[in-house]
Amino acid sequence: MQAVHARGGFDAFCFDKLNLLLAEVGHVRGEIPVTRDYLNAVGGTHGGWLSTLVDVGGSLAIASHGFKTTGVSTDLSVSFLAASGEGSNIVFDARVLKLGRTLAYTRVDIFSGDKLVATGNHTKFVAREQDRAAQEAAAEKPAPANTSE
């Protein structure tokens, strides 16, 4: 999450209060309080914000495999099952279902208490070879010279 916040932009704005509860290979769980910024016109949690949580949650689950970058989305679908509103605490559970050579498939379930609020599937093009090359290039960069001596 530090990398998401450091980059700034939309994800950092939407999830500035996100707290990771679990991060293991292929599985990430986090929580975030619903504030007024995340509501729709009738006071419910906005579907676009929940969809973005599916996007970011799936990406974090992919990143848990050691990817420096998580590629680009090729498909995202969300089913909205129940309402939640301001003051509720949202918990998301994101899992990698399959990590193929070029595509990663994830599922993200979003809860408010015991209530399943939304569930989504997120597919990303992962370009494993490009990611490996980027990691190797970063590892081969020489350390900056120490000029303070």
Task: Locate each region found by the language model.
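Terminal targeting signals and extreme-terminal segments of soluble enzymes
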Residues: 1-149
